[in-house]
Structures are given as structure tokens and as C-alpha cells.
Amino acid sequence: MAEAEYFIWTNPEGDFEKEFGNITGMLPTGDYFIPCKRVPITNRQALVVFYALVSLLSLLGNSLVMLVILYRRRTRSVMDVYVLNLAIADLLFSLTLPFLAVSKLKGWIFGTPLCKMVSLLKEFNFFSGILLLACISVDRYLAIVHATRTLARKRYLVKFVCVGIWGLSLILSLPFAIFRQAYKPFRSGTVCYEVLGEATTDFRMTLRGLSHIFGFLLPLLTMLVCYGLTLRMLFKTHMRQKHRAMGVIFAVVLVFLLCCLPYNLVLLSDTLLGAHLIEDTCERRNDIDQALYITEILGFSHSCLNPIIYAFVGQNFRHEFLKILANHGLVRKEVLTHRRVAFHTSLTAIY
């Protein structure tokens, strides 16, 4: 999720890295390029404040989700396991935001080791979070449409599913960590960037392709199909609880699309521009640069919205959280009598 910066190579026999080292978006290719004046990004201080706020809310919200789920070991459901892993992914992603915020103001001042670590952590949890959302949609489809409730088997299998997601996310993220480094290009500040000489463009095109396919298109298609079939099933029923679940499912898909679809569409446009599949003009480059800046903010904010969508709107979650507070003497136990729910449904009822 890098901000696009465009510089022009006017000397094909010159130093490639000096000309292109400061580019963090898709590299242009060829011998000569039309000189484009990059539109400077304003309000960087406001962006830092926003990143800090998102990081704080994500740390707090996802920590509470983890606390509630880990506190109830005996009644933990398959859905709880997915939500727990999703909370871990969002929490780890939020740890990278302070580094990204500082880099917006001062460039990359943390050196190569942290460049690799932050890149790995950010991409790793970006992939795992999206893939977990897709798995949640499949689980809800099976639970509601096909009413599969072999809990013992599902609890056993879900652990392997989550391990598989983490493993695939690690494989997809490793190239970012291996090839990125703190690099100070000619007449510019230090950046955290892949530096492979003339192979940089092809390499980044490959990474972009992986991100488009595994980081958005396949998970989005899975969610739309599974939630679409689930909603169709719910429309045929008249059960109050299932209609409540339908509303939450709609909110989940809507928030995901609002946060992630704009950024991924702009990123796809940037990829097509770098591959010369769409006309390359200075105005278009600057428009994409500004759009990446704005939509990236939406994408990052999704990490702090997940706890609200997946937990805090659930009656069971609120009851379990109050129960923890009551057990530690922080609230009166009489409060729980007004919020008593069926414990065996766990967090599943909110889906």
C-alpha cells in the first residue's frame, strides 16, 4: 500500500537507480518519458494523527475481542476461532501504522532491518485478514444454508484452515521482506523500497498481480457468492434471529467494500498504467497518485472497524464482556440479569 511517486528517466544510458530510486509506486518503463511535475501531498500532519488514531482504536478494539474469546475456553465456537485470528491479524497490522506515519513525514529513518520487518508484518497481515474474511463467509454459508453443525470436526478442522491461511499469507509476503531495503536515491530522502535495477518493474508487476488476485479478487468473489447465497436463504425464512444475522452480514460486506474496493480499484489502475495498458499522461499519473493517498486511508481504517462489525454489535459479546468486568468487581452482577443471553450460541448469532 505504497504512495505512488513518479519521476522521469530522460537519459537511457545514465544511472537507473539514481533516476528511479525514489519511486514507491509502479515504475515507468522505456527510454524516454514526458516530464511530469508531481503534485505534492498536503496535510501530512493530519495523516499522521489519523494513523495514530486508527492504530490506537485497532489495538484497543482487537485486544478486547481477543480477551473475550480467550476468556471463554469451554464454550468457544468455530466462529470464535476465526474472529480470534482476524483480531490478531488486525492488531498486528495496527503495529505497523506508527512506522508508516513517521515515514510520511520524514522518509524511512528506521534502517533496512525494520524496513524488512514492517513490510513483512504489513503485507502478512493484509493477506491473512482478507483471507480470513473469505473463510468466515464460507463458514456462515455452510452453517446457515446447509446447517452443518458437526462441531467437534469443525473445531478440529478450523485450526488447520487458520494455519493454512497464515502459511499462505507468509509465502505471499516474503518477497516484500526479502527484496525491500532502506535506500537513499539521488537527491532524495531515504525510502523503504525494492531495488533490483532494471528488473524492478517486472518484479513489482508480479507482486501487484499476487496482491490483486489473492489480496482482493478471490476473497471478494468468495464473499459475494457465499453471502449472496446466505442472504437468499435468509429471505426465505421468518426467524427473527436469522433476519438479524442478515443485517449484520450486509453491514460486513458493505464496510469491506467501502474500505477496500476503492483502494484496490485505484491500485489496479496504477498497475495497468505501469504496464502501458492504459494511456499514460501526467494528469492521469497525478490523479492516481492522489487517489492512492485517499483510498489508502480507507483501507487502513478497516483494521479498527472489524471489532465493531464482528463483535461489538453482538449481544453475546457485550454480555461476555460485562461478565468479565463483573467477575473482577468492576460492575455489579445485577447488570448481567438484564443482558442474559443463550451462552451456547457464542458469537455465531451476530453473523
UniProtKB/Swiss-Prot annotation:
Gene3D superfamilies xrefs: Rhodopsin 7-helix transmembrane proteins
Cytoplasmic side: 72-80, 139-159, 226-247, 314-351
Residues of the signal peptide: none
Family annotation (CDD domains): 7tmA_CXCR1_2
Recorded family membership: Belongs to the G-protein coupled receptor 1 family.
PROSITE patterns: G_PROTEIN_RECEP_F1_1, G_PROTEIN_RECEP_F1_2
A GO MF term: C-X-C chemokine receptor activity
Keyword Endoplasmic reticulum: no
GO process annotations (BP): chemotaxis
Organism listed in the record: Mus musculus
Cellular localization per UniProt: Cell membrane
GO CC annotations on file: plasma membrane
Record protein name field: C-X-C chemokine receptor type 1
Keyword Cell membrane applies: yes
Origin: domain of life: Eukaryota
Residues bearing attached sugar chains per UniProt: N22
Keywords: Cell membrane, Chemotaxis, Disulfide bond, G-protein coupled receptor, Glycoprotein, Membrane, Receptor, Transducer, Transmembrane, Transmembrane helix
